[in-house]
Amino acid sequence: MRLVALLLLFPLGAGCSGDPQAGYCDAVEEHQRVLTDIAASEDAGALFGALDTYDDLREAAPRDIADDWDAVIAPLRWLEQVLADNGVEPSSYAADEPPADLDDQGREAIEAAAREVGAEQTVTAMAAVEQHALDVCGTPLSR
């Protein structure tokens, strides 16, 4: 009898809890235009313009995708910081033609941070958050 009562009450409790994905999906839709503009940009530094948006999405993200957002954001923040520490404008940096006043230590630090951005873990995490937006929210992060 208790089992029957629990089963009957479960839909009531589930209905009151709301959809934990809804807030995240709202955030995805809210930020979609900004991410679309950044994705379409030919400016190499435009990606750093997405970081505040990525932070917002990370904050809204359900637990099952939050770690992937962290894996995307952390290397980008590190690269952004290394570039700033070395006085390098992200939009103008080219590994094959670094600024003349950039010392070897700075160049190596930038290259190490850039490798992390392009690392398999980062790329896999980005693919996961993109797929999650499609699967759960029914829309891509950018169009």
Question: What are the language-model segments listed below?
Answer:
Residues A22-C25, E29:
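Juxtamembrane membrane-water interface segments immediately C-terminal to a transmembrane helix
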